[in-house]
Curated annotation (Swiss-Prot):
Gene assigned in the entry: pyrD
Cofactor: FMN
Protein name: Dihydroorotate dehydrogenase (quinone)
Family to which this protein belongs: Belongs to the dihydroorotate dehydrogenase family. Type 2 subfamily.
Residues binding substrate, per UniProt: K69, N114, R115, M116, G117, F118, N179, N184, N253, T254
Details of cofactor binding: Binds 1 FMN per subunit.
Compartment(s) of residence: Cell membrane
Enzyme nomenclature, EC number: 1.3.5.2
Annotated pathway: Pyrimidine metabolism; UMP biosynthesis via de novo pathway; orotate from (S)-dihydroorotate (quinone route): step 1/1
Coiled-coil stretches: none
Length: 347
């Protein structure tokens, strides 16, 4: 029985209940199925290796951060055929995130609005979950760990939170993502400004070099940016990434723009909009970044991928790898295999 058929059966039920409840139910079911060995034959990662940031990825289709914020479901997610998995965003201390409800479906737009607010159990619990996963213990694949700042940390001290998290997740990560682009943590996107970004990247790079010496292993750091930036901001970010010799950039996070979903139910809800409406703006940022960075720094493309053709468009815009999230909600895990097939390198 194919994952496409199974998801077609499950989707009407999942879409009939609260989006966050459906999210949690799906993850629990996947973890349970994996623990019982029921998922072992669902999907092996397609073999289409790509070397990016010095890492060889089994294939170029990954899971974006946000689905598994606490790293509690890694083994279940690893059965779906991803070339890499990114978990988080995690913060130094546990926090509940924003009040419920905080996730909304816009099915006519193949979109989601969320204002989760980095809800997570804190970095110590996160690291324990990663360590406990078979995926980590058996070195089964590529694991990205995504870090952020606590909501009650003043923006002027944000770098402290990133450094705390980097120190703790570094030994367990294939790569680390620095999330400065969620619209759901007050003032977070200020860190994309020239002086703020310079200060942040300088200290992250210094810590990375120290940790590489300490652990005898270099772990790449990628920066995750927003789609709601203009050409000048893109140039500023690109120059800072090059100046500080960062390892990669993930483009993009969710958008605060509502033009594409105007007058739809839930369109006025606060939060970040993901899915099909962010596809074009994300691609525009990727193209502009590619023009600035050339081949000096790889781009991981995320935002609005709902088909293999969409994944191809991200690569054509300048990305080296792609990530999925909202597309999985609307298309199910068959989307992973479809994207991997569409991106398969010619033999």
């Amino acid at each position: 029985m194919s994952e496409k058929f199974l998801y077609a059966l499950a989707r009407p039920f999942l879409f009939a209940i609260d989006p966050e409840a459906a999210h949690n139910l799906t993850l629990h079911a996947l973890r349970r199925a994996a623990s019982l060995g029921w998922t072992s034959a669902i999907a092996k990662p397609a073999h289409d290796p790509r070397t990016v940031m010095g890492i060889t990825f089994p294939n170029p289709v990954g899971l974006a951060a946000g689905l598994d914020k606490d790293g509690a479901y890694i083994d279940g997610l690893a059965t779906l055929g991803f070339g890499f998995i990114e978990v988080g965003t995690v913060t130094p201390h546990a926090q509940p995130g924003n009040p419920l409800p905080r996730m909304f479906r816009l099915p006519q737009a193949n979109a989601i609005i969320n204002r989760m607010g980095f809800n997570n159990g804190g970095v110590d619990a996160f690291v324990s979950n990663v360590q406990a996963s078979r995926f980590y213990q058996n070195k089964e694949g590529i694991l990205g760990l995504n870090i952020g700042k606590n909501a009650d940390t003043p923006i002027e001290r944000a770098v402290d939170d990133y450094l705390i998290c980097l120190e703790k997740v570094y030994p367990y990560a294939s790569y680390v993502t620095v999330n400065i682009s969620s619209p759901n943590t007050k003032n977070l996107r200020q860190l994309q400004g020239a002086s703020e970004l310079d200060a942040l990247l300088a200290q992250l790079k210094e810590a990375q070099q120290r940790l590489a010496d300490q652990h005898q292993r270099y772990v790449p750091i990628a920066l995750k940016i927003a789609p709601d930036i203009d050409t000048e901001q893109i140039q500023t970010i690109a120059q800072a990434l090059l100046r500080h010799k960062m390892d990669g950039v993930i483009a993009t996070n969710t958008t605060i723009n509502r033009e594409a979903v105007k007058n739809m139910k839930h369109a006025e809800e606060a939060g970040g909009l993901s899915g099909a409406p962010v596809f074009a703006s994300s691609n525009a940022v990727i193209r502009a970044l590619k023009a600035e960075l050339g081949d000096a720094l790889p781009i991981i493309g995320v935002g609005g991928i709902l088909s293999g053709t969409d994944a191809q468009a991200k690569i054509a815009a300048g990305a080296s790898l792609v990530q999925l999230y909202t597309g999985l909600i609307y298309r199910g895990p068959a989307l992973i295999r479809e994207c991997a097939a569409a991106l398969r390198a010619p033999t």
